[in-house]
Amino acid sequence: MKLKKFFAGVVAAAMMLTMGATAAFATELEPVESKTVAVNNNTVTVQKIYKLDGQGISPEETFNFTVSDAEVTNAGTNVNKNALPVPTIGSAKYEATVEGGATTAGNTKKITIDFNKDGSLIYTGVGIYTYRVAETAGKTLGVAYDTKTYTMKVTVVNGDTVGSYKIHSVSFTDNATKQKDDAPSFTNTYTANTLSVSKTVDGALGDKDYPFEFTVNFAKNTENAEKTWTDAITAEKTDANNSKSTVNITSDSASFTLKHGESIKFSNVPAGLTYTVSETAVNDYETKINGNKTATAAVNGKVTTSADTDKDEEIVTYKNIKGIETPDTGVILDNAPYIALLAIVAFGGVALILNKRRRDEE
């Protein structure tokens, strides 16, 4: 009986020791997060996605990132909390080409965060290290920079040998949503499109072979005054026979002529510009811009329209009308039948009056 009680006591003591050891281990090492990124040779990667909204080719640009605001919890005694190690982060370079720049589907690159320095792990003690990872906003016109900030948590534990350390896990939390993210990414968008200007001549006296003079100017609008612009706009003119030719753009402007049925298209116009289209007025022509009637233009004047660019295609139509205002003769041929009819009626009336008078005299 005493022996049974002794064994029962031993079993109970063993269970208590096991539970205590389990609890102690649990507090000593935090389990791996359900959402972590893969660690390869003490490095992790995040994604950079560059998208195109509209039509155009994004300018060459290198996107940079920062790792900052280092903090640590559960730090070992040999960790200097006033000089915490900070990993390095790479950059993403995009070319000014169709395939090497922003694309509609999104051009994706890998950004490496490196926890090594001179071939060794930067950490010299255990702890849970946290950082803020963000993109450095640039100033390229037409580019929307990602303002997202991630909190990166790096859990460092004892290594396989005394005095060595290793990364147990790396996880990211989106600071905006407070959600864990196992595929952190930064997305930028380049927005650009086209501007088209066309010419139509109408009216009985409209000269369809006359070359109307135009000037188009581009300038950064007030909201984007601090942005930089690479001036990569191109222009192509199409005549009435669908033949195409290049139009030079200098100093943010282009001068050209358009006849009836001709047009010009400016490509790769970034969002954030203000364009101004001006036509040199020709005497006696009424001008309509995008179907809206304007006053008859005076000689040497300008007929102008302007707007800001965005992701949508801009289309400007100029229609010049010159009709007959005052007849050159006293007779309008279109009224001749009615005049002849009135003459016949008048002649008949006179004949009746004369015939009646003759009868009365008899």
PLM ranges: what are they?
Residues 2-362:
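Solvent-exposed loop/turn and edge beta-strand elements of beta-rich ligand-binding domains
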